[in-house]
Swiss-Prot record:
Organism: Afipia carboxidovorans (strain ATCC 49405 / DSM 1227 / KCTC 32145 / OM5)
Cofactor: Mg(2+)
Alphabetical list of Pfam families matching this protein: dUTPase
Recorded coiled-coil stretches: none
UniProtKB keywords: Hydrolase, Magnesium, Metal-binding, Nucleotide metabolism
Protein role: This enzyme is involved in nucleotide metabolism: it produces dUMP, the immediate precursor of thymidine nucleotides and it decreases the intracellular concentration of dUTP so that uracil cannot be incorporated into DNA.
Family: Belongs to the dUTPase family.
Pathway: Pyrimidine metabolism; dUMP biosynthesis; dUMP from dCTP (dUTP route): step 2/2
Transmembrane regions listed in the UniProt entry: none
UniProt name for this protein: Deoxyuridine 5'-triphosphate nucleotidohydrolase
The reaction(s) this protein catalyses: dUTP + H2O = dUMP + diphosphate + H(+)
Amino acid sequence: MTEPLRIAVTQLPHGQGLPLPAYQTEHAAGLDLLAAVPEDKPLAIAPGERALVPTGLAIALPAGYEAQVRPRSGLAVKHGVTVLNAPGTIDADYRGEIGVPLINHGRETFIIRRGERIAQMVVAPVVQIAFEPVAELPMSARGAGGFGSTGR
């Protein structure tokens, strides 16, 4: 296994005491993000409602990397709760708190307690591009076939 990429992290005051994000298995792609809501004030998300859940973390990604905030499959399948703008992108030059916009598509109010795993974060390399205007694009086997053009 290669040496892990080192990423600077700051725990904000309301995130103090929570463990840092961690991989749950040896080959996991995403680290679990935890809710940094007050111990005595769980956050309730009613059906059809959304909330920005604080993590109490700020990170400094190295240039050439991004972090994506993605839903946790268990929350989506069991409760209908997912990340609203999935995947959310954290750019390398962002230094603010990581917030997770969750939406409740379920039928019951979903309660988020301090330290609950609410999303996963995947760090990946980024390639920046430069557009090159051309009169015509090269042909491909697919051509301009859009949604559903390769099957169901």
